[in-house]
Every structure is written in structure tokens, then in C-alpha cells.
A protein has these predicted regions:
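Catalytic domains of carbohydrate-active enzymes, especially glycoside hydrolases
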Residues: 15-35, 84, 91-94
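Glycine-rich, proline-tolerant flexible connector loops at the mouths of alpha/beta enzymes
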Residues: 30-51, 100-105
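Transmembrane beta-strand segments of Gram-negative outer membrane beta-barrel proteins
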Residues: 1-3, 55-58
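Active-site acidic/histidine proton-transfer and metal-coordination neighborhood
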Residues: 15, 52, 67-162, 171
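Boundary/entry segment of secreted carbohydrate-active catalytic domains
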Residues: 1-14
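Acidic/histidine-rich catalytic cores of soluble enzymes
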Residues: 28-29, 60, 119-215
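Flexible loop residues that form catalytic
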Residues: 34, 65, 101, 165, ...
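Short amphipathic alpha-helices and their capping/turn segments at secondary-structure boundaries
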Residues: 40-54, 82-90, 175-188
Length: 216
């Protein structure tokens, strides 16, 4: 089992984060896009810096507001995705996290969402990349892992799978037992986080009060 940590979990420059992650003996990183945007080098330079420290770039995140969109916005998002794929190939990163849509323009149509994610996965497959779909606890139409899995099942593409995040499941008091019914090969990535029990908006809770596992 590979162990990765999200760069957003640590403070400092991206270089400092990589050094700390390597010192903690992780195998790789989840690259948070704002960390890459603030990086002064190229994607290939970042890939080499990570490799020199013994780290892989396991996941690129997040890709927002994609599925369930009207046709024109969907086409624009496909173009946006292709540019992310360009970056991922330079980084040597095989997996992109697509989080469930929060846009007011999105449509609550699971069939549409599945078809659009299928098209995204098909484009990713042409580059030997994969797509992981994650239910955000504050998603407009999809906020539970079972809803996300339903869409992944409908999309039915080998390069599309599920990403699970313990915070998004447990913050909504959702029952995680159903995860055992999902085929393991369809779960592409698992993120573990802890948090204190707080009565507050789930977005602010997620962004400002998440802890490392076991530190809740």
C-alpha cells in the first residue's frame, strides 16, 4: 500500500513541504493545484525534485465543477481538463481528483453526470491517465459516497473510479459500512482525515479544522 499526503496539509513552500514529506517517509504526494501554481519551476522540474526525494506525484487535485453541466459549460470544461492532462503528463501524475459539483449552474441529472464523466474518463484513457470522483460533503447534488458510486457505476468506464474521504463521509454522519459493498478495484484512492466534532458550516469545518488521522 502506498502512503501519500496532500501538500495542502502542510505549511511552507512546496519545496519545504516535499522535504518534510520525504523525511516522514511517505511514498508520494497529492499535489494541490495552488501549491503547483505558486511553484517557481516547471512541471518537469517539480517531478524531478520529488523523484530526487524518493516521492511520486500520485494525485492532482482538485478539478471542480465538471459533471452535470449544461452542454456549453461541459464543452468548456473538457478543454480545461485537457490542459490539466498536459500538466499531469509532465508531472508524471496518473490520477486526477474530480470533486462533486457545487456550481449553481449544475443540473441534478445523474444520467448526464455519468455520461459527462464517461467522456472525461475516455479522454484521460487516451493519455493513460485515470479519473477519481469524490463526493464533497457540500456538493450541490452529490454529497454522499453512495451517490458518487452510483454515478461511477452508470458511467461504466475502466479509467473512472471512486475516491473516498473519511471527513466527507463522517462529517455528514453517513454510514461507512456500505463501502464494503463497492468492488475494491473501483476505489482509486482513499483519503483519511480527522476533525473535532463542531457545530458549524461543513465547508469552514473542512477547510479550517481538519486534523491528521487520530488527532480528532
Amino acid at each position: 500500500m502506498r502512503r501519500s499526503i496532500a501538500t495542502v496539509s502542510l505549511s511552507g513552500t512546496l519545496r519545504q513541504k516535499l522535504e518534510a514529506i520525504a523525511a516522514a517517509r511517505f511514498d508520494g504526494i497529492e499535489l494541490f493545484e495552488p501549491d503547483f501554481i505558486s511553484f517557481t519551476g516547471s512541471a518537469r522540474e517539480l517531478r524531478q525534485q520529488a523523484a530526487d526525494l524518493g516521492l511520486g506525484i500520485d494525485l492532482y487535485q482538485p478539478f471542480r465543477d465538471f459533471e452535470g453541466m449544461p452542454d456549453e459549460l461541459f464543452r468548456r470544461s473538457l478543454d480545461r481538463a485537457e490542459r490539466k492532462f498536459d500538466v499531469m503528463q509532465e508531472l508524471g501524475c496518473p490520477l486526477m481528483l474530480v470533486c462533486s459539483n457545487t456550481s449553481p449552474a449544475s443540473l441534478g441529472d445523474a444520467e448526464r453526470a455519468a455520461a459527462q464523466l464517461h467522456e472525461l474518463a475516455e479522454r484521460a484513457s487516451r493519455r493513460n491517465l485515470r479519473i477519481g470522483y469524490e463526493a464533497l460533503a457540500w456538493g450541490k447534488w452529490v454529497n454522499l459516497y453512495k451517490q458518487a458510486w452510483n454515478i461511477v457505476e452508470k458511467a461504466d468506464h475502466p479509467h473512472l473510479g471512486l475516491i473516498l474521504d473519511s471527513f466527507h463521509t463522517l462529517s455528514l454522519r453517513d454510514d461507512p459500512m456500505g463501502i464494503a459493498d463497492i468492488p475494491g478495484e473501483r476505489i482509486f484512492f482513499v483519503q483519511m482525515a480527522d476533525a473535532p466534532l463542531l457545530a458549524m458550516d461543513v465547508i469552514q469545518w473542512a477547510r479550517h479544522h481538519r486534523n491528521f488521522p487520530g488527532q480528532g
